[in-house]
Amino acid sequence: MKDRTYIAIDLKSFYASVECRERGLDPLDTNLVVADESRTDKTICLAVTPSLKSYGISGRGRLFEVKQRVKEANAGRQHDAPRRRLDGTSHFFSELQVNPSLAIDFIIAPPRMAYYMEYSTRIYQVYLKYIAPEDIVVYSIDEVFMDVTDYLKTYNLTPRELAMKIILDVLETTGITATAGIGTNLFLCKVAMDIVAKHITADKNGVRIAELDETKFRRELWSHQPLTDFWRVGRGIAKKLEQNGMFTMGDVALCSERNEDLLYKLFGKNAELLIDHAWGWEPTTIKAIKAYRPSSNSLSSGQVLHCPYESQKAKLVVREMTDLLVLDLVDKGLVTDQMVLTVGYDIENLTDPARRAKYHGAVEKDPYGREVPKQAHGSINLDNHTSSTRKIMCAVSELFDRIVDKNLLVRRMYVVANHVLPEADAPKKNDGVVQLDLFTDYAAEEEKQKAENAALERERKIQAATLAIKKKYGKNAILKAMNLEEGATAKDRNAQIGGHKA
């Protein structure tokens, strides 16, 4: 089989870089953070410029953490400043480097998701100047994989030269720089970008490019820590490995040779992927990714509330989410026969002594390691595949009442339409043989079915009209009464993309 060459490209601090360019500022010399300050200081920062990161600030921290770290850094600068006094501020890294009397300042830019998507589209058009779309996989808004195997000879370039040519074109077109990883498979190019490139010096344009093959991976990264730096190794997997004496990918590779059964016992079939990656192997190609079709599909909607909600207000939000999810089904020509609901409770249920005294149920830890009541989770089957708002809304409301503890405060919820398929492929209700009996009034049943079909047809026309108006005049052009109730969130979320300001 022909050896392949892959390039992964990650746009550097993408959201923050866009905000800098739009202000006429250099992303490599400006202290800027993208965060929605209107959501309080606990809001998550979507991006931080490299210069601000140099003060020990995480790229995905919370705004109050950024402010605290800058305050600490300024305290250190004041201690070292002439006369122990700071005489001004600057958000430019270069000015701060040459003038120790300046305090560190930074710009807080509210997110503009629609604008970032426009930038991402422009950058993708640059990629298409060099690589065909069938050889590109868009991994996220700021990251892509490319199979460049068949392009190196065409351009008479090495992989590094081609990567640099593409990145410099992006820089010239948009003013945004990038990091690249080159590898003999998708895993190695990703790891080269995520781990190796971070430890090399950037060139004058802020570009970093790193290369890996299987041999170099084993030589340089078998001893790398922490394990969570590696693609697809989360905290849970790393914790299990460490509990069993494996702290590096080299340890995992050694275990796969000496005691492979242990890995399968710990991770089941997922151990195969972990073992492959420990050796620097990855058989999946971009061609295989493009050809993949999932055996089952779903559509989902999730939401984390800005503050804890009582159950009735939370139910209102779930109903809003369900309503929009059904419209999404209709828009895509899809139907579902099962709804799944997950509701996560707030930490206040256990930190408030009065509420804690009333709760005697199971407890689990949230992603931050804090104890919270165990989340509610359940599913409900529909009579047949449908995209009826009325039917699905009733089912989800019934499911909410069945699984949610009415005495607990809710913080997050996820609604999923399961077993989704195109309406044309859906099996018809009562398709096939029907068992007859002497006690059923089939004439009345037939009339009832006709009335039901007519109601569904009317509902479908209303859904189609609603979608047409929303597409033409905006998502908030039509609102339901429930969207105006206290605690409703749909109106605000309609002005967002991915939960952030559009």
Model regions: which residues?
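Composition- and surface-driven signal marking solvent-exposed, interaction-prone regions
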Residues: 80, 337, 354-357, 428-430, ...
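DNA-contacting surface of Y-family translesion DNA polymerases
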Residues: 8, 103, 229, 239-410
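Short, well-ordered secondary-structure micro-motifs
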Residues: 191-192, 351-354, 425-428
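Short, charged/polar surface micro-motifs in flexible loops or helix N-caps
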Residues: 12-14, 38-42, 345-350, 420-424
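A glycine-rich phosphate-binding loop feature that marks nucleotide/adenosyl-phosphate handling sites
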Residues: 184-187, 276-279, 335-347, 409-422, ...
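Gly/Gly-Pro- and Ser/Thr-rich, intrinsically disordered tail segments characteristic of DNA damage-repair
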Residues: 1-276, 282-286, 445-502
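Acidic, metal-coordinating catalytic segment for phosphate/diphosphate chemistry
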Residues: 18, 369-502
